[in-house]
Amino acid sequence: MPKKILFTGGGTVGHVTLNLILIPKFIKDGWEVHYIGDKNGIEHTEIEKSGLDVTFHAIATGKLRRYFSWQNLADVFKVALGLLQSLFIVAKLRPQALFSKGGFVSVPPVVAAKLLGKPVFIHESDRSMGLANKIAYKFATTMYTTFEQEDQLSKVKHLGAVTKVFKDANQMPESTQLEAVKEYFSRDLKTLLFIGGSAGAHVFNQFISDHPELKQRYNIINITGDPHLNELSSHLYRVDYVTDLYQPLIAMADLVVTRGGSNTLFELLAMAKLHLIVPLGKEASRGDQLENATYFEKRGYAKQLQEPDLTLHNFDQAMADLFEHQADYEATMLATKEIQSPDFFYDLLRADISSAIKEK
């Protein structure tokens, strides 16, 4: 019988990306892969879109909140139902291990796997753990982290960032679509790429719309998340969503303006791409992006600008400072030891799964 592994994680693309990097490697080595998630979540969409040979199991999901809300009462029952469903799935499949990338949907499968004696491996991308992974850590065999964590967390293995981006732009596939975009851009202007992510694109979209003079100073690429804004005109390319074009657009840009999500930041670090971070504040997140941005700035990888300070004057000042010290930022990024290849992590995870099985 083939070995089986269960994956879970969802809610945002960032909670699915690493799973989609690892899953093909397990499939290639003959593992039967299953995924537990929300049928209405981004994880289901991304798994279906990938075309990978993965069996998806839907469970009920409820949001975990640190504050009082009447919705908590309903969500308690959803989480309880999700746990019962997860127990049934794990008991039926009898996988060798479960790997979780976090998000609210991941807690019931993690708890179920632990209760049924299955090794549980989780991954934390941010500077500090979110509520879901704080709970999951109590049930985990091992937690891998992108950032160094507190010493008292005995089950932590500090890994660094796992990314599959091409460091060499020449490795990337050519794109006729990109060539068409370049025809609208000026070679005399710097090219800026705005990446807002699923939760933070609106502010960038509005900033660009409110300041048409930006097009006189820069070539602008704006990943909007909104198909109604799609546009290709002089010095401006607005597109709602990209897949194969994502890395080529980063390579094409002289500088990237991004939110503070860990996945994007470390992709930019791996490519040694000059970037300005405008993190989501605590009113829109739990503050993890602020921590990530401060970490990157202190390491000398990037500069940050708080969202309330995102004015045209402050933006121009930040651009001038970044381009003036571009060589220093790029040298610091090129010297980083914080990036790991997918193959390295896959081999480590496989070894840890084998060790956990032998110890049972």
Swiss-Prot record:
Listed GO biological process terms: carbohydrate metabolic process; cell division; cell wall organization; lipid glycosylation; peptidoglycan biosynthetic process; regulation of cell shape
Membrane topology label: Peripheral membrane protein
UniProt xrefs under SUPFAM superfamilies: UDP-Glycosyltransferase/glycogen phosphorylase (SSF53756)
Sites where the protein binds UDP-N-acetyl-alpha-D-glucosamine: S198, Q289
Cellular component GO terms, alphabetical: plasma membrane
Location of this chain's protein in the cell: Cell membrane
Main localization of the protein described in the UniProt heading: membrane
Keyword Oxidoreductase attributed: no
First-level EC class: transferase
Superkingdom assignment: Bacteria
Cross-referenced InterPro entries: GlcNAc_MurG (IPR006009), Glyco_trans_28_C (IPR007235), GlycoTrans_28_N (IPR004276)
EC number: 2.4.1.227
Known catalytic reactions: Mur2Ac(oyl-L-Ala-gamma-D-Glu-L-Lys-D-Ala-D-Ala)-di-trans,octa-cis-undecaprenyl diphosphate + UDP-N-acetyl-alpha-D-glucosamine = beta-D-GlcNAc-(1->4)-Mur2Ac(oyl-L-Ala-gamma-D-Glu-L-Lys-D-Ala-D-Ala)-di-trans,octa-cis-undecaprenyl diphosphate + UDP + H(+)
Family recorded in the similarity comment: Belongs to the glycosyltransferase 28 family. MurG subfamily.
Role description: Cell wall formation. Catalyzes the transfer of a GlcNAc subunit on undecaprenyl-pyrophosphoryl-MurNAc-pentapeptide (lipid intermediate I) to form undecaprenyl-pyrophosphoryl-MurNAc-(pentapeptide)GlcNAc (lipid intermediate II).
HAMAP family with a match to the protein in the record: MurG
Name the UniProt record assigns to this protein: UDP-N-acetylglucosamine--N-acetylmuramyl-(pentapeptide) pyrophosphoryl-undecaprenol N-acetylglucosamine transferase
Taxonomic source organism: Streptococcus pyogenes serotype M2 (strain MGAS10270)
